[in-house]
Amino acid sequence: MGLIVFLTIGIVFLLIGLTANNANDSIKKKKAIASFYDLKATSIEGEEISFDQFKGKKVLIVNTASSCGYTYQYEGLQKLHTLYGKDVVVLGFPANDFLFQERGSDADIADFCEKNYGVTFQMFSKITTKGRNQSPVYSWLTNKDLNGWNEKKPTWNFCKYLVDENGDLIAFFDKTVKPLSKEITSLF
């Protein structure tokens, strides 16, 4: 009887330890292999934006959609931009990858974001976050051979990636993690 209790307790502690290790799988600190600062993307206004202008700042990259249950997160992203904008850049990438929740044109998206959420952070032209036509930005974010460690692709709209001030990807956050959560802001 004592041996069974001892083994059961040992197994429970082993499982707790394994779970604790898995909780940190979304936050890493490894040097990127390909430079984040070599990336470029087209702004929602149609201008090419070079990521080298973000050197020295943390960058939060979010795949967005206007007709999603998580669209309310635009408000939190804007607040984050307002509160931390001196040190943190928010980049929004509209995508129509999940149940066609971003059907509008770039002009429609820009208008929606401004009217409904007062968005002033940098928004980009609509992209694809996965598959054959994946944007170069999301190729870098989701390919460990480029970013150094991460292969997690967006599972839905409003997944977030955090790049540090040296251009290294340091964290991935699922759609349920709100922009102003401690999980994110503790890394600023």
Each predicted region: which residue ranges?
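Conserved helix-turn-beta segment immediately C-terminal to the redox Cys motif
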Residues: 57-58, 67, 71-96, 114-117
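Short, internal strand/loop/helix patches
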Residues: 107-156
